[in-house]
Amino acid sequence: MIPLRFYKLQGAGNDFVLLDALAQPLPEHDFASLARRLCDRRFGVGADGLLVVEPSHEADYRMRILNADGSEATMCGNGIRCFARYLWECRCPDAASLAIETGAGVRRVHRLSAERFQVEMGTPKIMPSPPISPSPNELGEAGQQGAPPCTPTPLSHAVGEGLGVRATFVHTGAPHLVLFADSVDAFPLETLGPLLEHAPEFPDRVNVSVAQVDAPNRVRARVWERGAGATLACGTGACAIVVAGAHTGRLERTVQVQMPGGVLEVEWSADDTLWLTGDAVLVFEGVWRATL
């Protein structure tokens, strides 16, 4: 038995277990298995993902992210705020900002108040139309195939006939298939999320974000995250929704995104940089004593 000190944090209800590899020797262990065990809500600590503090040659620190199923993630907008909250709390209380290395590149985080942080999320990429090729029968009334690149395309593969759903494929540090619907509450995300996540057209899997526009600067959303399932919030998903909405004329470039766990603020600035603002709360810390 090797006791591991951990920290439990959450941002807009998206929760994480954090381990500091600089403060304690982490066992030479299968990190995928460790993430699955720590994130288990009945037999572990319980979380959507695992964050690991590691040294970096490119930034102040490196953030390693593993999903609840043990898969590695490149970037997490809520996770990086929680990661930064821990660093300000326990390592660099006087820093004006922090540069954090992620799988998607170095991201800078600014502390606005004790529990509120702003992340420079980088430049989004609006990908070619989702590589989903529904049959003519599947298309139904949703539209016609052959939409040009970088525009929303009819999507009914795994969605069903008659929904009229259109999707935009956006990369904001993580790949998101963004769908706009009349009602996020009525949208069958728990059914369609895993089907789209594992669709053969996405060999690396994909996150699924569904949004309901309430106003040009306000949207309600839910996200199915690859490797974690339905979560209370998703930072890269909020960014992807704003990019897709602005790109298709539904939204302005500064938007409040209401997710089940709270509100995230996204700005897509004129220089093409995405900014994500939201809370990050250190909930508790403890020692995990389970046998590895």
Task: Label the predicted regions.
Residues 117-119:
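Intrinsically disordered, low-complexity regions enriched in acidic/Ser/Thr/Pro/Gln residues
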Residues 144-145, 157:
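Low-complexity, intrinsically disordered or signal/transmembrane-proximal segments
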Residues 139-142, 160-162:
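Glycine-biased, low-complexity coil/linker segments
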Residues 125:
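Ligand-binding beta-strand-loop-alpha-helix segment within the catalytic cores
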Residues 1-114, 132-133, 178-292:
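A glycine-rich beta-to-alpha transition motif near the start of alpha/beta enzyme domains, typified by
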Residues 132-140, 154-156:
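Ser/Thr/Pro/Gly-rich low-complexity, intrinsically disordered segments
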Residues 166-167, 175-178:
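Selected transmembrane alpha-helices and immediately adjacent juxtamembrane segments
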